[in-house]
UniProtKB/Swiss-Prot annotation:
Subcellular location: Cytoplasm
Cofactor binding note of this UniProt entry: Binds 1 [4Fe-4S] cluster per subunit.
Protein name per its UniProtKB record: Quinolinate synthase
GO cellular component, one term: cytosol
Record-linked InterPro entries: NadA (IPR003473), NadA_sf (IPR036094), Quinolinate_synth_A_type3 (IPR023515)
UniProt source species: Shouchella clausii (strain KSM-K16)
Taxonomic lineage from the root: Bacteria, Bacillati, Bacillota, Bacilli, Bacillales
Family statement drawn from the similarity comment of this UniProt entry: Belongs to the quinolinate synthase family. Type 3 subfamily.
């Protein structure tokens, strides 16, 4: 992927009041009209999400970007999302990420070199029996790898359907980069843990459960994780239930298998949002996902008790890098005809990655 290197944020943006920055953003939106689209992920901070033309999870935003005709897409999300937007839009459209440092630690846990080395070892061991699936929280190169080898992308919303689709193609699935989403999805489909193994890209070995038979392994999980969701624990669930037995616990499937099994419900951000919408007034919910979304849900549902499963949970730090300062600056530059924050995926990579994305979008 190619990105333009930005200069340091001009100091005067830090000195502006929030009202001044918000006014600049509104002026830019009015200036561009339909030629500007601002998609915002559910995990964005409140002062930024107010300017989103559309709010959604990874699947919804991917579909939106593939349908829009706006010339400029200023993506309030993280790096891999902006890459996906660029790959699903035309060459005449421009995708801007307000802060190029808004990455994803999970996506960085699977490099293309590591993945190709793993594939070589695994296909040597298992033959032509494996189909690769990648969570959309991955780099364009990993998506392209999956497209090249007959695989596809998945989101937390459609992971079950995509794993079922994969098993209709090959007897084994390689799921990367999030081991927890892969494990929880496979288990929900009835696959026992003993038939899953974890590929460690640092030791270049398959990690099996004690007593597991390597010949029976049908799900190969990449040793990656979300640094936010992995912080939720079974002990936190126990503490909530000890304090408030009537509270329901709902978590994201990027949490560990133990946490998902201990929770009352588990599902994507879209699932969590819809569950809260449909919940009866007066009900109590402990939510295991990113804090910006939890706080927003608490505000949107004053008739319910909504709080984080982890009372001192930090925000997704990279998602939180998209702030008013960077959004205002990127839009000011765009008005001057400067696309200093443009995300551009090389066409050879994009073509194969689009194949993986297209297989997903055709299946959901």
């Amino acid at each position: 992927m190619q990105v333009m290197q930005p200069a340091r944020l001009p100091h005067h943006y830090r000195e502006m009041s929030s009202a001044e920055k918000e006014a600049r953003i509104r002026e830019a939106k009015a200036f561009f009209g339909n030629d500007l689209l601002i998609p915002g992920h559910h995990y964005q901070r409140e002062d930024v999400i107010q300017f989103a033309d559309f709010t959604g999870d990874s699947l919804q935003l991917a579909q939106l970007c593939g349908q829009t005709s706006s010339a400029n897409i200023v993506f309030c999300g993280v790096h891999f999302m902006a890459e996906t937007a660029d790959m699903l839009t035309s060459r005449e459209q421009h995708v801007i990420l307000p802060d190029l440092a808004a990455g994803c630690s999970m996506a960085d846990m699977a490099s293309i070199a590591q993945t190709e080395r793993a594939w070589e070892a695994l296909t040597e061991r298992f033959g032509d029996t494996i189909l690769p699936l990648t969570y959309v929280n991955s780099t364009a190169e990993i998506k392209a790898f999956c497209g090249r080898h007959g695989g596809a992308c998945v989101t937390s919303s459609n992971a079950k359907n995509m794993v079922q689709w994969a098993f209709a193609q090959k007897p084994r699935v390689m799921f990367l980069p999030d081991q927890h989403l892969g494990r929880n999805t496979a288990f929900a489909l009835g696959i026992p843990l003993e038939k899953m193994a974890v590929w460690n890209p640092h030791t270049h070995e398959l990690e099996l459960l004690p007593g597991a038979n390597i010949e029976e392994i049908i799900v190969i999980l990449w040793k990656g994780h979300c640094s936010v969701h992995e912080k939720f624990t079974v002990e936190q669930i126990k503490n909530v239930r000890d304090r408030s037995p009537h509270t329901q616990v709902i978590v994201h499937p990027e949490c560990t298998h133990e946490v998902v099994q201990a929770a009352d419900k588990a599902g994507s951000t879209h699932y969590i949002i819809e569950t809260l919408k449909q919940a009866e007034p007066g009900t109590s919910w402990a939510i295991g996902t990113e804090m910006n979304l939890v706080n927003r849900l608490a505000k949107q549902h004053p008739d319910k008790q909504v709080f984080s499963l982890h009372s001192t949970m930090c925000l997704c730090l990279t998602m939180n890098r998209i702030d008013l300062d960077h959004l205002a600056w990127s839009l000011d530059l765009l008005r001057e005809g400067k696309r200093q924050f443009e995300i551009t995926v090389a066409e050879d990579v994009a073509a194969e990655a689009r194949t993986a994305l297209a297989r997903m979008l055709a299946t959901v």
